[in-house]
Amino acid sequence: MIQEEIYAASVLDLFAGNGALGIEALSRGAAKCYFNDKSRKCCEVIRENLNRTGFTAAAELSCAEYSEALSAYQKRRLKFNLVLIDPPYRKGFDRESLELICRLGLASPNCTAVCEHDAQDLSLIHI
């Protein structure tokens, strides 16, 4: 579905968990993936998975609150072609994080965002 957007892309995997989404993007040709999760345990798992898959050189991992990580990316003037958001279920972080990404100017002009959300919540359609 998003294969064309992945190749050579700068990817953000926010609320990365075990890193599976970002690692999949790297395996399909993404140039670089920035992983963020606030859980130290998740960050350890992501680091292990990157080592196992051989994608360490194409990855950057931060372990911080999502808003802090996004602010740090803005200071570095990063732009993302593909944003993967898989937040904790029913916490409202889906909308908040996507709005913050837009407000901070982190999305490239043709950015694609893929966001996991509650099936009953269709409000993201309007962002």
Regions found by a protein language model. Give the residues of each.
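Class I S-adenosyl-L-methionine-dependent methyltransferase catalytic core
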Residues: 1-125
